[in-house]
């Protein structure tokens, strides 16, 4: 069984691309803000919100970067990174409040939970048509080295036999990962997921 959310492209990029930001701090540490920007565009396209102040008919990097700078104060890049789920919820929640959007609620799903429970939560979100922000801190598997201390979105899954593959979106591209391998980091300090209600 496979399900992927409809998504969007920005001048050929699959979603926003942090590495192309003109602003140095956003380029280096703006991953949380970028996932929030992507969620806003997604919600406008598919959930009838009104969060992205530019045209949705033809998404451009220039306007996306401008939007990213509007999001930056809420999910500000910092020395330690946005390394807790609650910081993300507080920052993005403040943005939503300031933009008169009370339809979207968020709750944290700790990376300390069992992978089986995390898979269930992920599948439920995707089945509801909702992207899932994911925070990965350190990981023992070097497959995920470009995703360490990083926020990205999960936008699809594929289930077969005992395996669950997940579609991760970041850096303007998408990747398929084994969810158990992604979730079981081998480190005591964990990230986790953000679950939306809308």
Residue ranges, per PLM feature:
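Noncatalytic regulatory segments and standalone regulatory/sensor domains
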Residues: 20, 145, 155-198
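Residues that form generic nucleotide/phosphate-binding pockets
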Residues: 70, 74, 91, 95, ...
